[in-house]
Amino acid sequence: TFDELLTEHGSGRGCEICKPAVASILSSCWNDYVLKTELAPLQETNDYYLGNIQKDGTYSVVPRVAGGEITADKLIVLGQVAKDFNLYTKITGGQRVDLFGARLEQLPDIWERLVEAGFETGHAYGKSLRTVKSCVGNNWCRYGVEDSMGLAIRLEDRYKGVRSPVSYTHL
């Protein structure tokens, strides 16, 4: 564990350079749910709370929208959650909807509503795959020659949550 590593080789809680590297290596070794009680100390605050801390101390929440494809019902849920918690919304460059302004104590309630609607974390905070971007492909585009949406969704579903030393995005 990270605590055992510190006991043997260091002190403190880990710097911004060593902690993510050690977290990536150890997470790869046991490939388990990273928020288990014994594994949680490895996680940065953003990973632990599934929110990205902003300069004003609030958090942004970024649900996964594989390939940028989302149903009308899920859009309604995002809008209702944003309205109920007074969150600012923005379409990201990664084809997702980012919800800004959540207080730390609101995150469990926000995620409960999102998970109930079928969302999961978009890992916009962790060191893992964030998003696979796609055009609409041959499903809608007259110039499309392949099912790029289907491929993007399959790639994102296959690699979501896989830990790495840095975050990455498939284009």
Each language-model region and where it sits:
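Compact, charge-rich alpha-helical regulatory domains located at protein termini
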Residues: 1-12, 16
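Terminal amphipathic helices with adjacent charged low-complexity linkers/tails
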Residues: 13-33
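Long, charged amphipathic helices and adjacent flexible linkers at domain junctions
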Residues: 35-50, 125
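Short glycine-/aliphatic-rich beta-strand segments at the starts of folded cytosolic domains
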Residues: 46-68
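Short amphipathic alpha-helix segments
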Residues: 68-85
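A common structural junction motif
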Residues: 82-87, 114-122
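Helix N-cap motif at beta-to-alpha junctions
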Residues: 102-107
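Conserved small/polar residues in nucleotide/adenosyl-binding loops
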Residues: 169-170
